[in-house]
Amino acid sequence: DASRAERFAQRPQSRLWRAEMAEQLATFDYHAVMHDDATLLQWLLAVRDIGLTQLQGVPTTEDVLPVLATRISFIRESNFGVLFDVQSKADADSNAYTAFNLPLHTDLPTRELQPGLQFLHCLVNNATGGESVFVDGFAIAEALRQETPDLFRILCETPVEFRNRSRTSDYH
């Protein structure tokens, strides 16, 4: 049996990333992930260590995403449902259903159990704009810790209450 120190030394190491990661984004073939356990493992390790990957060759049908997600775990439902379409609606009750340009954000921080993994699956995009921008929050926190340790400490020690109110729900 490995000692506690040996197990600690062998633990997964997250990799912080910045803008240059876009050129080296870990990319996997959808069909290989679905049918080859070794590729599935490599994909899951990349998700664990980097936090963001891309699957190519994913069919553009609605039934594909739940099959992919349940290949690795169960799907946790939210007030948006099991799956939801991000689209512009006239009577939107969430920014997800508007054409607004959203700033960088974290989805569902009001939840006791935030999403462990999220998938974005583009079926059709006839609109201009709508690009997704991703940032590594841990890299931002590390830069803050290095550059302004006092502000980093305040961020770590100050409780923040998140709130989400809509016509049908109130989470905080």
PLM features: what roles do these ranges have?
Residues 18-172:
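Active-site environment of non-heme Fe oxygenases that use a 2-His-1-carboxylate facial triad
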Residues 1-13:
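Hydrophobic, ordered structural segments
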